[in-house]
Every structure is written in structure tokens, then in C-alpha cells.
Amino acid sequence: MIHDMIKTIEHFAETQADFPVYDILGEVHTYGQLKVDSDSLAAHIDSLGLVEKSPVLVFGGQEYEMLATFVALTKSGHAYIPVDQHSALDRIQAIMTVAQPSLIISIGEFPLEVDNVPILDVSQVSAIFEEKTPYEVTHSVKGDDNYYIIFTSGTTGLPKGVQISHDNLLSFTNWMISDDEFSVPERPQMLAQPPYSFDLSVMYWAPTLAMGGTLFALPKTVVNDFKKLFATINELPVQVWTSTPSFADMALLSNDFNSETLPQLTHFYFDGEELTVKTAQKLRQRFPKARIVNAYGPTEATVALSAVAITDEMLETCKRLPIGYTKDDSPTYVIDEEGHKLPNGEQGEIIIAGPAVSKGYLNNPEKTAEAFFQFEGLPAYHTGDLGSMTDEGLLLYGGRMDFQIKFNGYRIELEDVSQNLNKSQYVKSAVAVPRYNKDHKVQNLLAYIVLKEGVRDDFERDLDLTKAIKEDLKDIMMDYMMPSKFIYREDLPLTPNGKIDIKGLMSEVNK
């Protein structure tokens, strides 16, 4: 168990100064270097006279300088706001408007003109590192102080900045490094692929730094180039893979992504979107002895609140994989519309309470009041997810409440439709989306389909292909759930965080 993230990092800087903490395409940085660089930058930040505990925006990608900057800010008592350098300009501006940062540290080239906020660019940061200024940690982030603020991808209005405190982070980290479901290896060698602006990144950097391991970063330029991606992955000595299931699906396109090529890759941790039986089965075939962990949780509850190691029995018997056993320190309940707890087996909204729950959204009391509340004397959060609990304490996912529609009198879970579409022998991936009429009622269901390789060659027309898919699914899908229109694509759009962009497709359909 750790009690202070900075003290833990400092401990490893003293006891294993020459051990690698960060490796980005062979450029290696040690724990000793991380201490020297973050000390020097923390001293410089202190000299700027910023408002105490004010948030600082950090802009960039997967560079080592990002990690060193985060550590420096934590030492100097400031929360950091990670913003990915591939973000849309409107999003960056919206985050600036909401967050009102006291400083911008730009590891990538900052794309906006800013008059009223000082900026440190990467050349200045590098020069500060070279100064090697000693630093005594006296006012680091602690307790309920904000450790980081991550902005969600809000589809309407301004994005919301989720405030995660040092206590929140400790609740998550100590659970992950001690939980038998994860079984994190000693001194883990972890893949660092999800961008720092996505809280899934905390699932790789927090346990790695807490246990003195090494992060192996994958820059976006590599991730976006299939040839480079597969060549790079095959050379990385990572034990632990942390990503969305969608990114794993991308990796599975390479026949070399298997235990023979990557014998040291023994752990897969998934969060951020639903892990399907189909993806888990493919992974089990490629990595028969690997530990595949399905985790679940909203950003507002610090990365994840439940996790389970997927068994062969689950892969054989479950239509939908369980999302885990919940954290001991975080009471998790399923409630009805009146807020009453439901018995095991009954479906309702999942709520989480306890020390992992955020204090709310930065500078947004209205949205905070809508989502955060007190439940049985504890801070709690409405997840907006449907679920149920088994008698064995396993949490089952039932879909998003906002992805639940009413069509021809039937209540339909869009995720259920998508899950069934993905079971067709012809389908590689699929998503169901509703089209609304001018009265905002569902007019029909559409399916976006990516076909398996070679399938299109077997059919002259899309109509014949659609008939074949419907025939394939007739025994597992009710007629009222079957989409009336099938749209065939080479790929499905992803959000900047690597999830399938369902809401973007819904917007496209309903222009």
C-alpha cells in the first residue's frame, strides 16, 4: 500500500535511480532522471508565483516530458489538466474557458493564441531540466487537493472537468496493485498507449509508478500507422497491456499478435468501453495463458470501481461478460428510479459511493449537483449505467441509460442490438444507431457494419449481403430489434480516446 504518490516515486529514485521509468521507442529515461527533471521544473513553477493550488494545463502527446511535468506539478502543489495535442481547436478553447488555468506547459506546439495565461514551451522546459535545480518537497498535492483534472468528451455544451484528488488516486491505486483480479506483476513493464487526456491512462501510469516499473509509450504517429504499430508492438518487452477493447481489436488484425511472438505479454487490462465475448475469445485463442481483466468505472469514480479476470467458463456461457467484483472501499449499489436499493438480480442504475468518488466538475456547480449526491452518508455518483448484481457479488452491465430507446412500443438497448449484430459470421464489428423523426421519436434503426475480410467478394449486391446477415441472426434477434437499414463501412469512427464513436454516428444519422 502507498500513502503518497510523490514520496513513492522519490523512494524509487533513491533505491533504483538507474532503473528505466519511461521508454519511448528506445529513448530511455530513468527514475533518477525523473527526479532531477521534475525537481528542477517544480522549482521553476514555484518561482512563477502562481495562485496556490491553481490548475495548470499540460498540452502534448506521449512524450517523457509530459510525465516529468505531471510529477513536477504534483510536487509544487498544482493539479494538472492533460490535453492531447491531437484535440480539436474548439475543444481546447472550451477547456481553457472552463478551467481558467494559471499556466500552460506546452510539450506539443500549442495551437491557440493566448494573451492572459503564461506559456512554457518544450524548449523552455528542456532548458529548465538542464538547470538541475535541487528541490525540497514541502507543499505537494495531498489529501483532498486535486491531483489531476480530466475533461470528458461532452457531446453537448462545454466539456466537464472531473476533479480527482490525491485521496481518490490512492483509493484506486492501492486497490489495483493489491487486487487478485488484476494480479499486477512486480515492477510491471506496462504499455502506455491511451493518451493522458483519457483517464484509462491512469490504469497504466499509477500502478507502474507505485511499484517501480517501466512505461513503454506508443506515440500517436505509431498508433495511426498499422505497419509501424505492428512492427513496434512486436519489439516491446511489455508484460501488461492496458487499452480499450477497440485498440486490442486493431492489434488482433496482425497475425503476429500472439503469445509465440510476444511470450512476455501475460496481462491484458480493459476499461473505457465494453469488452465483448468475441474480442475476449480472440485474445484467449492468441494468448491462451494470459490474464484478461475486464474493468469498469466512470472517470468520476477514478478510473474503475470493479474488475474481474475472465474465465473460460465465462467465455462459454456469458452473452455479456461481467464487469467485475467491486472495490472493498467503494460501496456500489443498483437503485430504482426512486433511489431505492434493488435486490440482487434486478436491473437498475449503478451508483458508486466512497473515497474514489470525485468532488465534482471544475467550475460547474450545476452539473455537479445533477450527478453527485450523498448516499447513506457517503459521497456518491450517478453513473447513468444500467446493471445488476449477482449473489456472488459480480456486477453485470446492462448498457447506458441514454442508449436505451423506445421503438414501436418496445424498450430496446442499442448495445444489445450491437452485441447481436457482432455475432454474425460475416461481421467484424457493428453498431446500431437510431434515426429520429421531427417529433424526436425513433423512426427506425440503422446498422453500421464493418465486414470480415473477404466477405464482400461472396456477394454481388449489398441487398444480398444484408439478407444473409439477417438470416444469420434470425434465431438470436427479435424482429423488432433488427435494423431496417444496413450501412457498410471500411471502418468505424473512433473517439480521440479510442472508443467507437457511437454518439458521432448518431449525430451523422440525425443531421
Curated annotation (Swiss-Prot):
It is found in: Cytoplasm. Pathway: Cell wall biogenesis; lipoteichoic acid biosynthesis. Coiled coil: none annotated. Keywords: ATP-binding, Cytoplasm, Ligase, Nucleotide-binding. GO terms for molecular function: ATP binding; D-alanine [D-alanyl carrier protein] ligase activity. It catalyses: holo-[D-alanyl-carrier protein] + D-alanine + ATP = D-alanyl-[D-alanyl-carrier protein] + AMP + diphosphate. Its main location: cytoplasm. SUPFAM superfamilies: Acetyl-CoA synthetase-like. Its EC number is 6.2.1.54. InterPro entries: AA_adenyl_dom, AMP-bd_C, AMP-bd_C_sf, AMP-binding_CS, AMP-dep_synth/lig_dom, ANL_N_sf, DltA, DltA-like. GO terms for biological process: lipoteichoic acid biosynthetic process. ATP binds at T152, S153, N294, A295, Y296, G297, P298, T299, D385, Y397, G398, G399, R400, K499. Catalyzes the first step in the D-alanylation of lipoteichoic acid (LTA), the activation of D-alanine and its transfer onto the D-alanyl carrier protein (Dcp) DltC. In an ATP-dependent two-step reaction, forms a high energy D-alanyl-AMP intermediate, followed by transfer of the D-alanyl residue as a thiol ester to the phosphopantheinyl prosthetic group of the Dcp. D-alanylation of LTA plays an important role in modulating the properties of the cell wall in Gram-positive bacteria, influencing the net charge of the cell wall. This is D-alanine--D-alanyl carrier protein ligase. The gene is dltA.
